[in-house]
Amino acid sequence: FIVEGGSAGGSAKQARDRVFQAILPLRGKILNSWEVDESNLLSSQEISNISQAIGVYPGAEDLSNLRYHKICILADADSDGLHIATLICALFLKHFKKLVEEGHIYVSMPPLYRIDVGKEVYYALDEAEKESTVKKLDKKKPGIKKTVTRFKGLGEMSPGQLRETTMLQDSRRLVRLTIDNASYTEELMDKLMAKKRYADRKEWLEEKGNLAEI
């Protein structure tokens, strides 16, 4: 698990299964590596740490030294966390593409909300799922108080909550990073990440920005 933030990394280390799970905390925002030459990539300490931890160097086609079958990106569920997760996805898509093609890269989906109903606990990924869950619970358990808590970040979650929502195989949610259309993926990521595409990005946001729920 590549985990955003030192405090969350500490909780994640307590939450993991030590037999087959490992934690790499990222301290600070990772470099936008989309336009960085691979020869200069490892000068970034965070990227160098990722490369050493997984056993694969940027641009490698040979994965025989890969240390983990699943590499999971674990960041906060808010917009800042999604930004960091996007930067890490861009790193793998651009410089560790073979890992993506072979299905080794995943994005963890931590909850943004916790819903307490009596002694029962439910988790929701986002606002829409929270509203849907509360609505179902109102029908299923009418008259019982529902308490909704919004997590400010992974560091606010206890090791037990992190284990249940992001690490236990039976209850966690993972999305595998895939490339279905290479040219489309390259163009989209270039538009999102390349500094030289500022004008295109601005135009895209003006046209499509109203389609996003903030």
Task: Tell what function each PLM region has.
Residues 1-214:
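Conserved phosphate-chemistry cores used by DNA topoisomerases
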